[in-house]
Each structure stands twice: as structure tokens, then as C-alpha cells.
Amino acid sequence: MIKLAETKRQSRPFKLYASPWSAPAWMKSNNQLNGKGYLLPEYYQAWANYFAKFLKEYQANNIAFWGLTAQNEPWDGHVPNFTFNAMGWDSSSQQEWIVNNLGPTLESEGFADIKLMILDDQRPLAPKWAREVLANEQAMKYVSGVGVHWYLDDVLPFPFALDQVHEEHPDKFILYTEACNGDKPWDTEKVMLGDWDRGEKYIHNIIEDLNHWVVGWTDWNLALDLQGGPNWANNYVDAPIIVDPSQGIFYKQPMYYALGHISRFLVSGSVRIGLTKDNKLEAVAFKRPDNYIAVILLNRYIFLFENWFIGYLLH
């Protein structure tokens, strides 16, 4: 699939990043892949070595990774009986492992250019986590960015947390590394075919994030079936493409078109520029590498807006 994606990307850069969910059970305090458990300190170096070996094996097959997260949702591993793969870290232990093990190992094995991301968890956690991990000079050296997930964004709508991360660490990027619809316990219908509210929710979140220093946004799933799986932990959710294998067909969801619309106009290397508006439309503007200006607009209201764009040339 990766090779196929590379052939279809045309001239755009193709960036892969990897995210571990759990070390092998025998390396962990609870001897399980899921539930409340932590990486045992005696295996800190072995786990770092695994990262390097993972990258080398892909490299041997002509697949290069752009980035890594240190751990997917490290807070999940603090939750007793957490249902699927997880491993707990706090900011202190993650800093220690990166400084003493992961960072030096990636550097010595020829992967110093890999973009290492910390946190990879919910937005409200980001300011404190980044502040504490990056308080160490060596951690600052090894870490390139902060990964953020969207799952609490509509419950705790605090985009200024992203501003805080940027203001305190302007040389570290912020990347949204995971998002999907149908993830909440109250989402009784996990897959909703043709639901444009879910497409609008994607665009709303992307515009909000881009206006608060986020540099990219990633969906969790490429494609799922009509149930929102397969998923061994019964964690069913929605996806931009839904496949009906019994009929040999697939559906492009509104979320697919939402992502496609933004991706078509907002290309890699674009720089966000200032924008003011006098109505309730959601908007973000970028100057592209080809010097064109791209403006992404979202109208979530039932009435129409008439829009006039005024731009200025700076010489």
C-alpha cells in the first residue's frame, strides 16, 4: 500500500510517520499489551533499539520515514483495564527515555534527521507536557515537534493551548496526528454514510488548528468497513472511505471530500498569512510556494454569505 501511495502522489512530498502503541508485554510492568502498564526501566534501551531496527527494516525495502512519535496516547497506559494496546508514560519518564536512550540511539544508527514528536495525545495536555519534556537541553536537541489528537477538542474547546505550546517553543512544530468521527461513547451510530455534519466537523477543526500554529492534520483511518472496523477491541469508528466487501464497492464519505478539498489547495510549504473578516464564516489563509494565495472557508449556517476578498501586495 505504501508503494502504491508513492506512485500516486504525483509531485507532492510523501511523508510517513510511525507511532508505537505498546512494547511487547514482557517488557512492561503489567506483562500485558493493554491495561495500566509501563515500560520497565531495564528495557529502556532495548525499546530504543527496536525503534532503530524498525526504521532499518523499512529502509531495506526502500521506504523511508519522515517522523516518529515516542508513544501513542501515553495517558491511556495509566488507565486500569484500558481495552486496547497502550503504554503509560509521564512527561518526566518520557524525557528521561528520549534523552538517555531513544535520542542517542536514533542519532548513532543514522536516523538523526527523523522528526521525533512527543505527547501524541489530547490537546489540553500539550502545554504542560511540552514544557516539562523540553525543559532539558538534550531533549530540545532530539525533539522536533509535538503530536496532538483531536478527541477532546469538542468537549474541551481550548485552542489557545496550541498557542501556548508555540509561544513557549516556537522552534517546535505542532502536528495533529490522529482524528476520527464516531469515537465517543454516545456515538451510537459509528458509521454514518453521507453525513455532512461529520465532514464539516473535520473542516472546522482543521481551520481552527491551522489558525493556532498547527502545521498538518492526519485522519486515523484510510478505510474501514460498514461496521467501522475490523477492530479486535471493538473500537469501531467512521472513516473517509467505507468499504462494503460483500458487494465489492466503497463509499467516499463527506470526510473524504473535506480532506480532499483542503489538500487540493493547501500544499506543503505553504505559509499562513493574516486574515480578517466581518462575518461568522470560519476561514484561514495561506501563501503557497507558487505565490498563489489559498483561502479555506467554512459556512456552517443555514443562510448564505456574500464574500468579497481584498488583498494587498507588499513590495
Predicted regions and their residues:
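Substrate-binding cleft and catalytic face of glycoside hydrolase catalytic domains
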Residues: 1-136
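Conserved, mostly hydrophobic/aromatic
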Residues: 16, 54, 68, 146, ...
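Substrate-binding cleft/loops of secretory-pathway carbohydrate-active enzymes
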Residues: 121-144, 148, 183-194, 227-230
